[in-house]
Amino acid sequence: MKKLLVLLLFFSIMPFSLFACGVEPSPEAPTESENRSEEEKSDPTSDLPAINDVSVPERSGSFKAVVLGDSIARGYGLESPESMRYSALMAESLGAFYETVDISNYGVDGRTGVELLEFLKTDPPKEINDCDCVIISIGGNNILQMLDTAQTAFNALMELDPKAVADYFKYAVAPEGEEKDKLAYACDAISSVFGAVNAAFESETFNSLITDAGKRLEEEIPLIVAEIRKLNPNAKIYFQTVYNPYKGMNVSLKEVDEQLKLDDYGERSVACLNAPIEALSEELGYEVVPVWTEFDESGKDLVNAGISLLPFDISVDPHPNWQGHELIAKIYCDIITEVK
């Protein structure tokens, strides 16, 4: 069965979706400075996404950026984060436009908005002082309190019996009779699991936590921006929206009473986080980077989460795969080169 793309943070994010965060520790110092050598820059060919689909002008000047944020920024789950995450891909692509490109990455797994604010107050990256722009990926981990609720839902999903799934498809094509009656249990088994997942995400506790996470982010964004402005009043600030890692992960099966609605829950959750990101941009003078919209509209497999019922396979990891990082890099490069 065709793989369905999926969902909350959420963020940075977590071992599970926007709900959980990566568990690998990351240092509070840049894990890289993405400078391309002159030899590397001399080769114009690249598998990286095309930028703006226009002729590349002669390289000139320099570009310096600082990336702040969570596990998405750090590249959690990639085989080689230092070379495959979107900041590294940006450095590679922007090398066709600038003589020197320097991107310092301070992404940390599980980092929340309040933790980023504390980092900027107590140990700000020195690179911010003279950088051209600051790139922020934050918000998903603000819903860490939802971990118990999300874990309950995902545990229920993981308990879906592969044999019941296989028997369901046998049931769907079996002729009426004794054999079909024996397989009918599969409909109830799948419906029960889907119902348990839905109940967790539809609970009052879950919805309250989503709302609170959005309110906290609304309070934190002005403080984060203010700290960056203290360090560098002239730096351009880019704040990326949170994508829905469970896009396409609604599942409806004939004669199964419950529909699995992870896409719906994911969309509702990220909307609460993206609302303040978008609403405050004009007032605070930062640019919103539409990662949420671009992921929704791409139609590609951009995250690790997904469901395949035949063969049976489920992943709820919300982090971008390499293609996801490629798309994020392209979004930034298009914006940056447009104003060059």
Put a short name on every predicted segment.
Residues L8-S17:
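Bacterial N-terminal signal peptides
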Residues E115-D212, N244-P245:
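Oxyanion-hole/transition-state-stabilizing segment in secreted/luminal serine hydrolases
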